[in-house]
Amino acid sequence: MAGSESRIVECINLMVMKKVYWTLVAIFVAAALGGCVNDPTEMENAPDMSAGSRKILTSAEAEAGELLVKFSKESIAAVEAGVTRSESTRTGIQPFDAALKEISAVSVERVIPVVEQHEADARASGLHRWYRVRFNDQVSLDEAARKLAAVEDVEVVQYDGYVARNFTEMSAVPYNNVWSSDRDQINTRSGETPKFNDPMLNKQWHYKNTGDETLVSPIKEGCDINVEPAWEFCTGDPSIIVAVMDEGVMYKHEDLAANMWVNQAELNGQKGVDDDGNGYVDDVYGYNFAKDQGDITWTDPEDSGHGTHVAGTISAVNNNGIGVCGIAGGSGNNDGVKIMSIQIFAGRYQSTISRNVDAIYYATSMGASILQCSWGLMSGAINSDEQYLDERSIEANAFAHFINTKRPGSPLNGGIIIFAAGNEAGACGYPAAYPSVVCVTSLSTDFTPSVFTNYGMPADIAAPGGDLYYHKNHSDAGQVLSTVLKLDGMYAYMSGTSMSCPHVSGVAALGLSYAKQLGKTFEPDEFRDMVLASVNDIDSHLTGTKTYIPYTDSATGIGYDGLMKMDTYKGQMGIGMIDAFKMLMAVRSTPAVTVGQNKATKISLGKYYGDVARLTYKLSVSDEVADKLGLTYTTGEDGTVEITCTKQGVGLVSVETSNGGSEVSRELAIICRAKIASNGGWL
């Protein structure tokens, strides 16, 4: 019995009840230490742990009458042939079929559809070996799992279960409730001409934070993603697709409709027919995996507008004279990145873990390069990478498929997955903490961690996610402003790591758009590293304490006492705060340095361009850049240059290097901000 029990998987947390027996511990180690994106389920020469029997805990909250089975590589061909011959009631593997008979099985079907043009990718990642077994729901799940796991050709048996919402953000606060008198005004604050004519852009402090205390307080200038200067180089590209795995996105929204991904074959096809042969019917704007239908919904009871809010941060239409801006929403010329709605929540309906895998497969097959995930398990439900691999084998397999599968014509030879860290003010939740994905924490308006944000060593990067119980005036304006449902006035404030996460997804989408513009391509691990390197320091801001209004989280029942010690968060919020301009410069292969306004900053050019002992340097600044930044400089004999800027902004300068013979001219990006970290902007 030990061998069969070791193949049974189950989970006993709030979201999905399943437990995975995972033999490939060596792959977990590689992933944990190196962030490897290879599929752990497909690696060879892993240690055999079959002798170590695992205790079966419970299957009480798993979906009755259903189990997920992964067959061995050696047996899968026979299974495929057997299932085809028997119309999905038998596999052709006698011991397994005998077990099916004992549990009164009614069907055996693949978790993902068979689609000819994508089948090679499915087989490369091993997703084709996962099957869903349905049987009499009066049969004990535990007993059925034991019987199937006893078959030698079965690698894993996993309980399936429903995925519950983990949106502990506050309810949306309509824009008009906060700024009832100036919805249609464009406040330029410092007399500057805004980049775009969207009237609410000036309230999106998370894009450009001028430290304006009439907006909200406390607030610090520069606590933003620095997207405005990035828009001078790129605003988006419609060939880049971001899959929003969330509630349904309101594809008719006035500020989103033009940037929605559209499956033209289904849009122009017949209702109820899989017109493009991709295995999904009527998937015009994505697919509703919560209800297993093509129609994306957002008007069911308990829908919150969560997915629509997330989508707006990434790609609300820019420069259209209405509403808000999206990070990669284009310039008003139908040039924003596209949003694909991967709906896993719909009112009282929710996806299962196996349908989530199907959803990730769909997003991959239909060309999405970025998977935006503001959902996940509660903090503490899973406490280690090893436990995650033990309990969510099929999900890890699907992530690897998304990351490693190439999309035709994409500047990224694979994909990137970006997750919210969670909102319990504890350890980062899973899957966000899993090394293959990017884990995003949340910052308030002043570089301090948001009251609710999860944190810890698995955190990769931080972004603005707002705060509610912290601010003294216009407290709602300290949250993130984006698109929502009509019920909430089409635009509203929300806060949470669900709101910080799409800032990173939006910047990543902007980076891929710029790569497309420049004709560059990147490998998944290379691009991920570029995203994580495109940051500004936050640890220097984490001193003393932060006070806020004590509250109790209605979703978890956890009480918060109103005091945060900032030292606790140092080195625990990720490498830094995402910077959109630095992201584009990384794509451009141009080093970027930040200088403080009216503060002389010494830069060592040799750090970027070679050994100062062998090379000489000359800085060249155009009149346009000098005037734009108020830039003056002096050069030193040791390969340094001291730069002073009197105006905030960005500019490109030239650095000419010479070794006594040939000369090479290279770019250096100068970013001038009002305030910078104590380390002079270096990371």
Region annotations inferred by a language model:
Residues 30-57, 675-683:
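Bacterial Sec-dependent N-terminal signal peptides
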Residues 37-40, 232, 236-238, 247, ...:
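Substrate-binding/access-modulating region of protease and related hydrolase catalytic domains
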Residues 600, 610-640, 668:
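Surface-exposed or secretory-pathway low-complexity segments enriched in glycine-proline
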